[in-house]
Amino acid sequence: MEVRLSAHGAYQHQYHVVWIPKYRRRILRGAIKLFVQEQLPQIQQYHPDVEVQQWSVQIDHIHMVLVIPPKYAVSSIVGKMKANLSRQLRLRYPELKRTYWGAVLWSPGFFSSTVGLNEAVIRR
């Protein structure tokens, strides 16, 4: 991974992020899965300096590797991604209303961890 430059510093922040549908429902299959896979890289339209490097859509969760500049909180970026994707899915697939009766499609939390150097590399 390369070092990126911002106005007043340099950074190398890479995050592994996982989130799940509410109630861990197995909705991410078929056409919905394909639609989600197409939409995940679109975050760069809203935040050009956030990079989606890798993603994997499983039947009941989503994995992503993101490069997020230090000026953004990981939680705000993930929250916006979940909100935008939820809105698009509910508009395109009205049958989701049978499974999710409110405006909420995703579980409220998410998992994130940093990706990068391990302890052995740092000691060297």
Regions found by a protein language model. Give the residues of each.
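Basic nucleic-acid-binding interfaces
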Residues: 1-124
